[in-house]
Amino acid sequence: MRFILVEGSEQFKPEYWNRIVAVFTTGQTWQFKNYKWHDPDELFKHTLGIFVGWRGDQAPDNIRGWGHRVLSTGIDRWRGEGHDASRFRDKEIVEHIWRAIEDNMRARGWRKDRAPAAL
């Protein structure tokens, strides 16, 4: 399966919205102004939300308010040269994100040979 990562939805055609598998969010609702579903509660009924913050920091209030529909995960802060022992955990986080995306896709009817008719 091939994935296409895009920075924004400005160039989206209507049929693209049925192929969205995840939305990375900063927690600011203005980022959804050009989306088919402007309201985060509605958006995350149709697709998985993902927030990546710093390990040990609490996610912003907006993200916590969106509940279980947004995966909130954290990476270690960069501590400078010679302190990169924690970088191996980045791979764990990336694998966790991909697992969540794939699990969500299966739950919504995605298969290797076809996408669901509608999200």
Predicted feature descriptions by range:
Residues M1-L119:
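Extended amphipathic alpha-helical regions
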